[in-house]
């Protein structure tokens, strides 16, 4: 899940991601959050994780904004950007957003 603390649509989507995570974490669903915050945004990024209740363990950011290495690898040019990755490690769905739970159920 690519996001940033300054991204209002990302922050608005976070409660839904948290809800789906809490519902399916015991069935093999996990979230890997990649923040596109800037170098001077580390404190805001960490605060947003707490404020939004992003309780999963996987949070990373190189604090390089749009020059983020993971964003380049995944071709991310806008956020929020979510990838559902299947059990074989292949990208199954890109940006399911409101359809997240339904798409996830197809993979579990």
Language-model features: where?
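Thiol-/selenol-based redox modules, centered on thioredoxin-like
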Residues: 78-108
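Small/polar loops that bind or transfer phosphate-bearing groups
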Residues: 2, 62, 96
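Short active-site neighborhood of thiol/selenol oxidoreductases, capturing the structured segment around
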Residues: 1-11, 17
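Flexible loop/turn segments at secondary-structure boundaries
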Residues: 6-9, 38-42, 67-69, 91-92, ...
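Structural microenvironment flanking redox-active thiols in thiol-disulfide oxidoreductases
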Residues: 12-52, 65-71
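Short beta-strand segments
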Residues: 1, 31-35, 60
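Short, internal strand/loop/helix patches
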Residues: 46-83, 87
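A short, structure-level motif marking secondary-structure boundaries and short turns
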Residues: 5-6, 31, 52, 96
């Amino acid at each position: 899940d690519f996001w940033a603390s300054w991204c209002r649509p990302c922050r608005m989507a976070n409660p839904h991601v948290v809800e789906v995570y809490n519902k399916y974490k015991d069935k093999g669903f996990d979230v890997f959050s990649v923040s596109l915050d800037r170098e001077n945004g580390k404190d805001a990024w960490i605060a947003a994780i707490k404020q939004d209740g992003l309780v999963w363990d996987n949070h990373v950011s190189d604090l390089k904004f749009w020059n983020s290495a993971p964003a380049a690898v995944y071709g991310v040019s806008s956020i929020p950007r979510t990838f559902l990755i299947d059990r074989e490690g292949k990208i199954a769905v890109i940006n399911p957003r409101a359809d997240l739970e339904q798409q996830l159920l197809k993979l579990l």
